[in-house]
């Protein structure tokens, strides 16, 4: 299975086919030997370049071939004037297109194309000029042609993300319009094919950029309204084929972004290392302001973003006199960058207007027992309404098609149950309802558990939530 799509069965080769493969293998071995000779000679020659290009038709996924070709190109470029170098690279890009059309899922071919394109940009930067916009837009058009053959080609989708990154840097004035058009394009693709995992994923990369451009804050009513059509489309996709994991994954992404942050676990080991695990990633750097001067504890986190806090507690008989109070002081931070050939990077740090980081008061008694109190703030009515609606719709799907759901949707239901239970347990006005709902939810899980062993993990996960509270 790959993104919910079954792979074709591999049939056994006949003796004639095996013999043919042996001959082909000998031919490829001879070509490989010649390629290694070119590598050892390490000198740019036109005949060597022609041989490598011809060989790539038979060996498109041979890494050494493309590495040598890049080395020779880099040797040759300094000998050319800027205009000549640009012409050389454009010719190189065009020369590999027929090979790409025959091998549309070759990592190395797509990488070589973007490598050449970046070289073109480097020349333009050196000249103090800009690459023509039509070149990058033309690459988007190329992707569209490949999608006509296979709209799920994730190599092509990854390439499109890289082109998006280049456009964001070099054509900022039109980038906002381009993002809007790309969002419309993703809707077209997933509407035609609900199983288009890459289209859903690409959409999830575009939306954070769109929100920044239009000053839309996550976890607000305005942000949720943006997803109105998306949620209807997801519902249609899931009801069409509950086994398809693509819309499920996109739904999980939306739910995560509109769910209050909660604490998954708090553990203190024998070495006095305290680890607090949260349900979402947040910015560690902002915690330094909260901890301030070190007293009986030390914050160990070194990374910029994490979903857990690591604190080393010092041995002290009077530790119970000290308290660690962790509260939300994060600020929004979105990075849209291009570093070499990396993809567009979107890192969103959650705020109290965004996701609620629970306030924790932690202390340690003289007997060494860990004592803590958790309070979840800033849970909004529209959040609860949204999550409740998703829960109701999934429960409705269980009634209509329990067998399909058990095999595909149980993880998402478990996540929703966990979120709801944590919200209710942390809010005084919802605590009473929490116990009643938990009984109903566990009853639902037991019913599903009888139908499939795969429900065991889900059932035990829900029951273990109470360990966080005690």
Q: What function would you assign to each model-found segment?
A:
Residues 1-64, 71-81, 85-90:
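Extreme N-terminal leader/anchor segments
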Residues 208-470:
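Structured C-terminal portions of repeat-based eukaryotic scaffold domains
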Residues 28-36, 73-80, 121-128, 164-172, ...:
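Boundary/linker elements of alpha-helical solenoid repeat scaffolds
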